[in-house]
Amino acid sequence: MQSRLLLLGAPGGLGDVASRRVRLLLRQVLRGRPGGDQQRLEVRLLHSGATDSGETVSIGDVSYKLKTPKNPELVPQNYISDSPAQSIVQHLRWLMQKDLLGQDVFLIGPPGPLRRSVAMQYLELTKREVEYIALSRDTTETDLKQRREIRAGTAFYIDQCAVRAATEGRTLVLEGLEKAERNVLPVLNNLLENREMQLEDGRFLMSAERYDKLLQDHTKEELDAWKIVRVSENFRVIALGLPVPRYSGNPLDPPLRSRFQARDIYFLPFQDQLKLLYSVGANVSAEKISQLLSFATTLCSQESSTLGLPDFPLDSLPEAVQILDSFPMMSIEHALQWVYPYTLLLGHEGKMAVEGVLKRFELQGSGHSLLPKEIVRVERMTDSHGSYAHVTIRVAGKEVTIKVPAGTRAVNQPCAPDHFIQTVSHKQLLAEMVQSHMVKDICLIGGKGCGKTVIAKNFAALLGYSIEPIMLYQDMTARDLLQQRYTLPNGDTAWRSSPLVSAAREGKLVLLDGIHRVNAGTLAVLQRLIHDRELSLYDGSRLLREDRYLSLKEKLQLTDEQLQNRSIFPIHPSFRIIALAEPPIVGSTTQQWLGPEFLTMFFFHHMKPLVKSEEIQVIKETVPNVPQEALEKLLSVTHKLRETQDPTAQSLAASLSTRQLLRISRRLSKYPSENLHDAITKACLSRFLPSLAQSALEKNLADAAIETNTEDSLEPELENYKCEVVAGSLKIGAVSVPVHNAHEKMKVPDVLFYDNVQHMVVMEDMLKDFVLGEHLLLVGNQGVGKNKIVDRFLHLLNRPREYIQLHRDTTVQSLTLQPTVKGGLIVYEDSPLVKAVKLGHILVVDEADKAPTNVTCILKTLVENGEMILADGRRIVADAANVDGRENLVAIHPDFRMLALANRPGFPFLGNDFFGTLGDIFSCHAIDNPKPHSELSMLKQYGPDVPEPVLQKLVAAFGELRNLADQGIINYPYSTREVVNIVKHLQKFPTEGLSSVVRNVFDFDSYNNDMREILMNTLHKYGIPIGAKPTNVQLAKEFPLPEKTFMGYWIVGQTGNGMQKVLCPAETNHVDIKGPVLVNMEKYPIEKHEARFLSFTEECTSWKFPLDEVNLICDIAVSHENGEQTLYVAACNPVSLYFMNMTGKNGFFVDFFDIFPRMASGSWRPFVTVAPLGSPLRGQVVLHEEQSNAVLLLDTTGSAIRRLVLPTEEFTSKKSSWWSKEEGETYRMCKEFSHKNWVVFYKQTGNSLTVLDVLEGLAHTISLPINLRTVFLVAEDKWLLVENETNQKYLLTKPAHIGSEDTGACQLYMLKEELPSTGFGVTQETEFCIPDKVSSDQLSSENLTSAVGQKIASPNRILSDENSHATIVVGFPDLMSPSEVYSWKRSSSLRQPSVTSMTMYTGKRTNATPRHNNCVTLTHTNQVVRILPPGEVPLKDLYPKDVTPPQTAGYIEVTDLQAKKLRYIPVPSAESLSPYTAWISAISDTDALLAEWDKSSVVTVDMGGRVRLWETGLERLQQSLMEWRNMIGQDSDKHVQITIERDSNEDVSDPKHGKEDPDNMPHVGGNTWAGGTGGRDTAGLGGKGGPYRLDAGHPVYQVSEVEKDAVPEDVKRAAREMAQKAFQQRLKEIQMSEYDAATYERFSSAVQRQVHALRIILDNLQAKGKERQWLRHQATGELDDAKIIDGLAGEKSIYKRRGDLEPQLGSPQQKPKRLRLVVDVSGSMYRFNGVDRRLERSMEAVCMVMEAFENYEEKFKYDIAGHSGDGYNIKLVPVNQIPKNNKQRLEILKTMHEHSQFCMSGDHTLEGTEHAIKDITTEEADEYFVIILSDANLSRYGINPARFAQILTSDPQVNAFAIFIGSLGDQAARLQRTLPAGRSFIAMDTKKIPQILQQIFTSTMLSSI
């Protein structure tokens, strides 16, 4: 008997400290040679001669007799080391005891290969055969018991591992019990307990004892007939599992747990481990090794797990030491990073903790000099065992050569591969990867698009590996990873190895791309492959590590073939795995894929993003001719975004990955004119970013001096953007490309498409990318024409397309192949995707965002590397060179492209974030609704017959709605599709009104009141009368005009009255021009509101311009030029001018403050009149200040102002300054002919006229013999003058050109007003009255005829004065004969000085008459229009007795001489009035001024700055009313009848009237009575063949629309009472008074809309979180494609169904988000509340937060604090006392109010912010938000904004935002520039505060759910 001593272990000796020290010293000397220690366990193997089973193994005192295995190839090989550690021997001894007892064991312990290795060592020691199964979440009962396979058309049951082990007496090793889904493992319960099991095929497994008992009574044949099978007495189960709950997984089922005996297999004890490491790392100093181990052990301790640090993978330490052994000079800290990448794994605290431990064990700070620099060279060497390479690496100045596995192809030298640019960091990374490659598989971690795949490929090329890329996706099953079933041509089922398995056998390098996506339970099946290089497959074959395979081969003396027949294969020694992953999201609960189990499998290398210099190098070498300047700017922005901590910036940086930058550079180099701003915003898809991110991006771009293209704002003409196909090449815009010659014509789309500029621009952009070979992604709202654009694009390119539409249930299989069963065989049909790849078609992926992102991920490898594995084993590869001669390969056709279409990310679209996951592999294009111009031209083509104004209204209204949607005020983004549908309807049914047709779109919103209100307002603003009834016509009441009176004659220049004509001399001077001075013209947007939205009135449009509260309007004028009207409004306090073109969207404002300073004393009141000039001086205006006689010429196009000095000024008295002349001297300007570019000035009471000819620059002064009162220019050459004091009228005729030699001087005639003879009834003593207005042109002869009532054609003028409504002078001024005067007298004269007005005005007479008499003559419509104050209007007749007349700014009196009617139209009163009431009354006696607008309408401007247009002409009104009624639709109230036309078989006899029924009863049908409905031959309605229709007047029993809509009054009342009662009841419950309720309602209602919007979004989030998932392996549901074959074979659980996925057990609880609102309740809030309501707005904001988050406490926990002079943390709402009802909420608002009223002054904004940010993180939460409201005037309190910015960003975990209230001038804007982008808001208008809050919530909180 020979006995062999197998192993010696070191004890875990417990000697005293001293002896331990001595022992350690000795060990240092002897270096791991075990010294004289105490006794230890030995394993003895005793041979007892030749008998087979006589061998015994004893461990210590336990011994076990070996049996010869039946299948020796199933016994584990080479697991036992020569000297196992003592602790392992202890484990083995325990296992042997349990084995002898016949008990099943459970080895429990931390993740890692140790437990498996202990089990395998024991089985190898006892020569037991093993059945191994790695459980995963995909394991089902069939994997354990029996599986069906089809052989020759029959289904057989094949025993699986558990059954095989039981019958053959093997040991079943179950690994990963915590991975199996609940209730799968109980299948084994009975087998474990009683060794019994019922099988599917009818057999029954019975325990050995019972079977043997039965054998005593029955024969074996009988038992076989009963299908009873004996379970071997040697059958044992060893289960391996992790302790749950410490690790994630399903906890053990109690009945299952009770059937196992457990043993904790913890990491090796310190000493054993140390010894192991010493033996591995002989070159590394012992001290370093023990420090390394101490560090690792510390991180595995119980304390560190409470910190939330994942366990350190101790099992990887030997490999790390092995590397250090080859590179003793390398930094240990760095090697630790590979084993335990704590910088990626842990948050800030975790990192600090780990670094603390590193310091403690002196492992830190070994510097960068000790890192590997680069690979110097690679040499190939092949020996019998496979291929290796010698790689030389330079580390710390030395070169070290190591031997690493290599692939089968030729190796590359480090600098050889083309198109791989080596940067310093990449060289270093490659060197490090080779070091890891020496000992273990690698996992590369890096953000998307940073070049992981490129590095991995380069690494493979370096070592001569073939690559096997495997794209992983989320719902991948274990079968997809290892083996899949398929059918053989004869119908048998078989297993096909996955690429991973074949790669393992062939020694390839496997790229597991996207390992972070796969479920950890699925990856578990790879653990054994990675740790031990062993694998058991579903079909029973096993893969062994090569050395084990060889030793087995040697022992059994078998050939490779024989072993393969026994299904045993070697794994190639060169086989390696590189996993590619994105970094785990620190602190997130869901995406923490890098767990303790995963850490044991790989060495981790972090691929950091490129630094700027390297990125520039990469881009420059890849795209050599990229413009330098653009590149610099691009990278500076990108790196600035990457470096910030701000999550918003981070998400933007993610869209600017290296891959995107390369794409942008490629475009820039090909199209150098490309605008960088566009390129970046396109890459980030900024059009659809939340508003915060958008502003952050804009700010960063502005900082980097990247500007938008200024021309972009203007729309290019369609001429420049034509698409045309010329000579076989397509040209869109500036880009051209040859047209494709398609074979499959029918697949080329052809679509109705109307060209418009914007879509052309988009298509040009797409073409640019298409030419560069990019795949495109079009993102946009619904209905903006994404599909149309793509189809049109492909049509132009003549490319065939394949179309695939994704949806919720799209799976990876359905994207690639569709399996179907035909005749018992599985046949795969190519999906459009595969067809497109093969044939080179264009694949259009529609609704790309609807499929789960884990599915669409597989498109990534296809687009990026052109590789993809199909379900039937074929694979798609990029270059055809690899295809030749290898079957199952499909080469990508060079023409293949993918065009993906997706909706914009984010609410309200419910899609998944396709752009976020895959955006950077496509070139993205944001598709927007067409701009108004493009949209209009497109709609014209859809509705050629729809009137253009209607289309314009639609375009404008929808444009505004889209803006609202972009601002987040409404959720639904209205698109072109909706407008097109409306237009199509109007085109087909022109009589239907617009307002009823738009309801086709807007009825969706009719139940949402907020939304409805916004819609109504917008549509009404653009004059779409939705909700109006055609009967709502509210025109002014008409009164009869008094009869006309003949007033006598005006006689001019007749001799004999002693007054001969007088010649008036004129002198001509040049005008002195001073200037020009540039003036600042401010532009402001104008919102026009159509006035006729609910009822039809004379008013048609109104808008407001931004008038100061104290400013007054003193004159208005309108210029008409080529059909365009421009309105000029002059204001006088301060002097300023507003003007706007009526078709435009913008107004302009010019301030003349520096020319006319406002006087401190206020005694001087400037008064400015304005006269617009005509062409060629169009756009120029003369302004005249009446008291200083200053004449200014403003050029509005060149924004310059000149002063014109008139000659008269020279002899005016030179006073101290020209604006302080004595009172009462006023100069006037006559501007009737200013459009001819001349105006006349005169001084009241003066005796000269000055004619200013602006075009010539001349001034003609005419001296007169009389003192003037007023002047009317009744014609260009005839002027009516009125003398001062006497009011005598004169007519001045002037030659055409003053100053030319040949003409005479001006002539002055006296004008005599002669009364008719007294018989006419006109009294003699008529005082001369001064006309208010004399028209400067005449009535047409038709108008004159109808006015005077006799046919007459003659020159005439119409005038108006205070005594008459209108007066016509026939024959004046051209005929020298006496002119007849006809007048329509007023019942009482206007402006009778009443008592009140006398007291009101004091001072001189000039003040008593207002400056403007507001009278306009519309000669075209025969009307005189003026505005009267309410006192001059017959209000009693206008309004019924009991109605109080409304407040008005005055009434427009329309005297219509055509219809002989008077109408009074009320002008609504001004929204705000200047406090200078006396000044207003000096300007006008009404609060509005009037001017002629065009031939039949007038414009009024009130003192509050609101402009209104009024149509007064009857014809125009008639026409507008028609249009308005058409908009509403005439037939909405008509009685509609349904008629079905069918031929009745009865013939038609002669038509007749039929009998009249004496009783006139209603009749239907028949052939007898007249007046029936639906009969034949007789007259009636809807009949057949009758002579005519006859309605006998029967009532049609139909409630009219109006009545239908009206609910009876009593019902309404009951409803009201009920609501009131409920309200009272509710108040009583919460003890709130009605007064309080009203107060609260005031705050609540102000923010109702925001609350509503937020709650909708929060609801959606709740819903999104609860989306159901596919549950697989169900017994009912839909057939799962992946299990079709199992279905053929007759299995049951082959279905899948949607269900709520239970969270994985052990996965962390979802924590709520924390929000803290810190509001300002300082004294200044109370003090300035009166100015801008800031305190109230803050209270509204608080109210909004409280209301919006009510009932979402489990998702959002909020609290509200205040800061003021009293302190920085005033608790308003503590986190656990959320107010429940309105009363409690009101209490909080009251507290805020009172606090700010009574607190100390001072400011604690900074302290409040700092405290909130520090304090909020004390409690665990998913995300933290702090929002500060402050009105801090930072500079006043001496706070440095930079310090504030620093506090805001002090904790990267906390998203802090600041909202500043207040009007700090430009300080606010300066502040915003210093604060971080997107983090600070300035609320100049306090109304915005709730909106800003809503923005913050929607764009940040919601992004991450």
From Swiss-Prot:
Triggers of expression: Up-regulated by high fat diet (at protein level).
What are the UniProt keywords, alphabetically?
A: ATP-binding, Mitochondrion, Nucleotide-binding, Transit peptide
Q: In which tissues is it expressed?
A: Isoform 1 is predominantly expressed in liver, kidney, pancreas, heart, and skeletal muscle (at protein level).
Read off the PROSITE patterns from this record.
Answer: VWFA
* Residue numbers binding ATP: G446, G447, K448, G449, C450, G451, K452, T453
Q: Which SMART domains match?
A: AAA, VWA
Q: Where is the composition biased (Gly residues)?
A: 1568-1583
Domain VWFA, which positions? 1714-1896
For the region Disordered, give the residue spans. 1541-1583
Transit peptide residues?
1-45
Q: Where in the cell is it found?
A: Mitochondrion
Per the record, GO CC terms?
Answer: mitochondrion
Biased composition range(s): Basic and acidic residues: 1541-1560
| Region of interest: Interaction with PEX7 | 1-260
- Molecular function (GO) terms listed? ATP binding; ATP hydrolysis activity
Q: What is the stated purpose of this protein?
A: Exhibits ATPase activity in vitro.
The record's section on PANTHER family has: VON WILLEBRAND FACTOR A DOMAIN-CONTAINING PROTEIN 8
Subunit structure and binding partners:
Monomer. Interacts with PEX7. Interacts with PEX5 in a PEX7-dependent manner.
Protein's recorded name: von Willebrand factor A domain-containing protein 8
Instruction: Give the species this sequence originates from.
Output: Mus musculus (Mouse)
Gene transcribed to yield this protein: Vwa8
